[in-house]
Amino acid sequence: MRILGIDYGDSRIGVAISDPMGWTAQGLEMIKSKDSLKKAVLRLSEIINEYSVTDIVIGYPINMNGTKGPRTERTEEFIKKISDLGQFNIIKWDERLTTVSAHRTMNELGIKASKKKGIVDTMSAVLILQGYLDRIAGNKKS
């Protein structure tokens, strides 16, 4: 069982993958989506097949007041595109403050600002996926 974590953005898509047991999330890569969403979706298809992905957890942008905005609509369109890639569950995960947490973590690790741009999306995908993995692990214990 492998679960894919995605932080979708108009310019970049952060990607993370779970370990085979579904306990931990590891950053996989950042895919540029600004120039060609079609190429980005093709790369995701390759990853899904390579890792035999059973579930995809995608960061779902909700405003701080709980409403949906333009980013939510774009994410919904992206979800429609990836839902055609295979047989897997797609889980929408509240991503509020994920990018803030990713920046905070990178600051604590001493990562320079010039390097953050290429890492923040993948780090956000890791945080999204790990949040989901922690939730399902907690549900299994109950």
Swiss-Prot record:
Keyword Cytoplasm: yes
Pfam families, per the entry: RuvX
General function of this protein: Could be a nuclease involved in processing of the 5'-end of pre-16S rRNA.
Protein localization: Cytoplasm
EC assignment: 3.1.-.-
Name the record gives this protein: Putative pre-16S rRNA nuclease
Taxonomic source organism: Ruminiclostridium cellulolyticum (strain ATCC 35319 / DSM 5812 / JCM 6584 / H10) (Clostridium cellulolyticum)
The organism's taxonomic lineage, starting at the top: Bacteria, Bacillati, Bacillota, Clostridia, Eubacteriales
Family of this protein: Belongs to the YqgF nuclease family.
HAMAP family (alphabetical): Nuclease_YqgF
